[in-house]
Structure formats: C-alpha cells, structure tokens
Amino acid sequence: MNLEILLYENRKAKLLNILKIGINPFKKFVSTGEIEEELGLVQSREDLLNIIMNTFDKDENIILPIIGGVGTGKTHLYWSLKKRLHFYNTFYISLENVYRKFYYNMYSEYIEEMGGGEVLRSITNKLCAEWGATERKFGFFHIADIDKVRNSAFEKLKSNFDNKIALNDVINAITSHQLDPYKRVEAERWLLGELMDIRDLSHLNILYDLKRKSYAYTMLKIIIENSELRSVIFIDDFEKIVSLMKGDKKSEEIFDPSWLYGEEHIQSPETRSAQKALDKILDLQKIKGLRIIITLKSIDALEEIKSIIREKNNQLLATMKEPIILSNFLENDIFQFYKENMKAFLKNNNYLEFFEEFPDSYFPLNEKILKYIHTCSQGNPREIIKFFIKIFNEIIFSNNNFDNILAYYENQC
C-alpha cells in the first residue's frame, strides 16, 4: 500500500470517528421562514436566483409567482434570495399561519427585518425634515412648529391615502417621535407596533394602535416608500387563500341557503378572512417599490388566483409576471449539494483538510449511492435529504459494519 492510499485510509477513519460522536451532517431538512437556512444553492437554483434578481432590477411593483411542489425548496430559495439582495429589506410571511391581522403582522415582520428602532428613527427624522421640521419657531429654544409640520405632511400625503383619520394619526405619531420630547418614548412604542392602552393613546392624541388595519397599512406604505432600501415580501403557501375561499365542499342539498340569503351570508369566517386577506395583498400593489413573491404548489392554483384577481381588478394582472418553476434536482445537483454540505460539516468540525486533500471524494458515500438516492427520491430535495439522514444515522448509530451498510445501498441500485 503506497503512502497516498495509507493517508486516505487514515483520513477516512478519522472522518468516521467524527461521525460516531453522533453528529449527522444532514440533521435539519425542513427549512422555515423563521429559522435561517445555511445550506447553499446548487447550480440549477443559482440560475433561478439570477432570473429573479434581474426581474427585480427591471420592475418595481410586481407580483412574481414561484411554483414548486412539497419539498422542492421554496423556503430555502427565500433564504438564498435574502442573502443575495443586499440592498433590499426582504421579509417572509406564510399564509398557512398568517392571514388574519395581515397588515399588522406584515408590519411587525418588516420592522423587525429592517432593524427596529434605530432605522425607524432615521426614517422618521428624514420624513420630518421633508415636512419642514428644520424651520424653527422664534423663541429661546428655537423649537419646531409641530402643528405646521403636521399640516405640511398631511397636505403632501392626503392624495395617496383613502383613510384620512389613519393618515392624520400616523403623522401625529411620526412627528411626536421626532419633535416632542414628552411623547417620544410612547410614540416609538406605537411606531414599533406595540399594543397600547387608552391612556397611552390619549397621551399621543391617537385613536388606535397598529392592530387597526388602516393604521398598519398607512404606516407600511409610508415606511416602505421612504426607506433607503428597496423592499421584497415573500408570501409563502399562497394557495391557502384558494383553499379557504373555496370552503368545505358539501354534498348537494335539496335546499341551498344561498338561494335565500345570498352566497356572502353563508360563507364561513375562514372564507371571509381569506377574501379579505387577498384584497389586502392586492392593495399592497399601491405601495411604490414593493416587490411581491408568492409561492404556490401548482400551476392550477396560480390559474385560480388569476381568475379571482381578474374578477376583482383585471388591471392588476398586468403586474403579475410569468411564473418561475422550481423543479426537482438534476443528477448533477445532488453531487454538488452533497459535496457542499459535507464541506460545511467538515469545516464546522475542524477537519476541512479531508476535503482539501481529497476534493473528488464522496466519502463516506459514493457516486453509486448518490445516483440511487437521486433515482429513488425523483430529485425531490426534501426526500433526498431524508435519504441522507437515514443513511448517515445508520453509519453513526448502527452496529452494522460500515462496509456492509454501503454494500446494502449499492445493491439497491
């Protein structure tokens, strides 16, 4: 046995010892919008990412559908996109969990994503300056004329908002935040989306907190349109809207209550909430510079959404781009995916020299097993990772001989 082979065998033995500690390189296999995904992109996903970014560079107010079945990596794509869009506020909402209090939840996610109070203070300072806060009243302290600033803001913004009461209260909160030292703390709490009691609201001379949909929408529009960064909202599980609007399919009855009361009066609360949520999402198109990504599991679901939008406002369909199809992994993708994640695993365990010395090795698996996994999983990323977890768990925890484990999976091919 020559020296190179001996070195390789020693390196393999050390890698197996690291695995035997009980660490599975693929232990996490379901990506969520709340937990950051660290896995890299394979080449076919890189190409899709470039298409999305080019689309964002060309257009501002768009709806971009992404179609992908269960386990194809839609949420993983969100994390990869978020890392690439350095000059965007990119935030995630799942309609599986959030379709009630939509604007409030969206605003909360947006504020958290952009960094909270510090960035918010920068935006409110910029707004007050544009509204005339730099012009000072005469007097010992040369303070700004708050009423004049508020009137100026209202005149500049009123044509862009239907709810003038909400607009007036939002302006009060922003100007109090910057120009009134006695109300600054409460105003910042209000702007950050905290729920407030009547006493605090009265102190600010404001009727409602941001749980009120018109208030949350007004704040969203003002903050997004005046942020230094462009904005992307990634709305996952969009077909939830379709399923809720359909409601439960019932068998045909001799008497249908809708004949007497009308369809709108027999809808379930969930159906009405879904319709309202869709209306709110469509209203987001009025926010200048907001790019919207929606994910669905099928083209059929997208066509149903288009049909609903067509009935509500046919012009909005012009803002909807052709869908991007998130297909399963190609065979080359699984090799790249496996190598990249094994490399990350070795780096985290201070054993990157294995990868550096043997860059073409797929140890502890091999090409034959990787091809078997791709075939059995039909290229579905989630199913691929489940296979990896299963095989690595056997390597780590099973009493079976390592060579016998590999031989078993090789014989499945």
Where are the regions a protein language model picked out?
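P-loop NTPase nucleotide-binding core
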Residues: 61-227
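AAA+ P-loop NTPase catalytic core and its hallmark functional loops
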Residues: 31-38, 54, 61-65, 72, ...
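A short, basic N-terminal segment
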Residues: 1-64, 126, 130, 138-146, ...
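The catalytic "switch" region of P-loop NTPases
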Residues: 1-18, 185-365
